[in-house]
């Protein structure tokens, strides 16, 4: 129960941080500014980081740990000490929460969480949604989807839900067609039509970007795209839309 409350606290304060980062309207009066200043001074006197306890969070480097570093300042004002540890894969962050070594993690979407629980027998729960990172198709040896040729190789993540997102994105762009109802559990076995005879190379999510100079295209999770120096807006040849099935999870 304590871990659940800590996780909910973190999720809530992350949301507060997002709103705070948008800036003020600039319409504060002198009185409201003075009132805010008084409240902040009182808060600083009454609350110190760690007074309420420590929250330990496992996260992927980009952008999750970066977001947490900003949230750390807000949490400190609320009396919490936030300890962040960066992991490079999608397995250990869940295992350290399951074992009780960490209070929470920040890196995954709900379908992956549910799939992990099912496959690993873990008991993790969603503490709250924070933000959405779209999957994207990024250039490898080909600079445009118009250059797609028969037999090209496309690298995708190999874990259940992220592979499905990659395949759904390829389908949305006319590269393959999946069996009806495959959805977020789709695998390469669900490819019904492959007009370009593309070869799907399945790799651990953290390894996909590393083969960009060896394959025609790579399909990347948002965080690994950022780590590889890709921008969804500038570099993605195609990406998940805000109303996609994955975006609703």
Predicted segment positions?
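A conserved helix-loop-strand patch within extracytoplasmic ligand-binding domains
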Residues: 47, 127-176
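Alpha-to-beta junction loops
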Residues: 98-108, 152, 175, 196-199, ...
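Short helix-initiation/N-cap motifs at beta->coil->alpha
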Residues: 84-95, 183-210
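Sec-dependent N-terminal signal peptides of Gram-positive bacterial secreted proteins and lipoproteins
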Residues: 2-25
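Bacterial lipoprotein signal-peptidase II cleavage site
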Residues: 18-47
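Pocket-flanking alpha-helical
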Residues: 90-121, 143, 225-227
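Periplasmic-binding protein-like
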Residues: 129-139, 226-249
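Short, well-ordered beta-strand elements
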Residues: 50-62, 80-86, 153-154
């Amino acid at each position: 129960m304590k871990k659940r409350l800590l996780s909910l606290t973190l999720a809530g304060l992350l949301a507060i941080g997002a709103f705070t980062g948008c800036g003020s309207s600039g319409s504060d009066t002198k009185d409201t500014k003075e009132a805010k200043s008084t409240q902040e001074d009182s808060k600083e006197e009454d609350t110190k980081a760690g007074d309420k306890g420590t929250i330990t969070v496992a996260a992927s480097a980009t952008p999750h740990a970066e977001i947490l570093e900003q949230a750390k300042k807000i949490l400190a004002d609320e009396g919490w000490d936030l300890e962040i540890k960066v992991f490079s894969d999608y397995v250990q962050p869940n295992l350290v929460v399951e074992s009780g070594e960490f209070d929470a993690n920040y890196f995954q979407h709900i379908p992956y969480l549910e799939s992990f629980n099912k496959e690993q027998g873990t008991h993790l729960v969603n503490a709250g949604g924070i933000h959405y990172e779209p999957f994207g198709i990024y250039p490898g040896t080909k600079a445009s989807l118009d250059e797609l040729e028969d037999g090209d190789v496309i690298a995708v993540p190999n874990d259940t839900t992220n592979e499905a997102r990659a395949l759904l994105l390829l389908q949305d762009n006319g590269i393959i067609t999946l069996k009806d109802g495959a959805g977020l559990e789709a695998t390469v076995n669900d490819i019904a039509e492959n007009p370009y005879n593309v070869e799907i190379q399945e790799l651990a999510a953290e390894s996909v970007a590393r083969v960009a100079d060896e394959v025609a295209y790579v399909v990347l999770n948002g965080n690994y795209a950022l780590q590889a120096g890709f921008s969804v807006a500038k570099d993605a040849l195609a990406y998940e839309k805000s109303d996609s099935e994955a975006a609703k999870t």
